[in-house]
Curated annotation (Swiss-Prot):
Native source organism of the sequence: Archaeoglobus fulgidus (strain ATCC 49558 / DSM 4304 / JCM 9628 / NBRC 100126 / VC-16)
Family: Belongs to the universal ribosomal protein uL16 family.
GO cellular component: ribonucleoprotein complex; ribosome
Keyword Iron-sulfur: no
Protein's UniProt name: Large ribosomal subunit protein uL16
Amino acid sequence: MARKPARMWRRLERPYTRTEYIDGAPGTRVRMFDMGNKSADFPVMLTLVAKEAVQIRENALEAARVVANKYVSRRAGASNYKLKLRIFPHHILREHKMAVGAGADRISQGMRAAFGKPVGRAARVKPGTKIMSVWVKPEHFEIAKEALRRAAMKMPTPTKIVVEKGHELLKGKI
């Protein structure tokens, strides 16, 4: 069965995270949360910040992580950056599957036992939540900024890119 559109789960409602009570809760699709040169210390830090309260599906998080990591590693080099995904998809999404097509009315139970089955995960985000951060050297500032801009395109919320560390090193670039 095809994936439902993300707009079905975008709005924040009540959280549903207790996996010990949920049979068949799916694992997360996000493969890595820390990428690049994890041990080095970089002077400039940029962060992608959410502007609205939404649920971000794990598919969108993984797509944003992949596109940002690929862009920075190819342009700046594998040892010249550190990238961290700062949110985790704890919230479990449920779907009440409905039968469609000819004869569906004979098979369907309607809204009886309509709680739904787990189909995926999402991260719950409030305004001002840091989604993703990149640490780089001052000469790779523009590359990191473009990587976060590309990652923002995968998000279901408006975002902003904030320079959290290294303002003094970026005179004329900000």
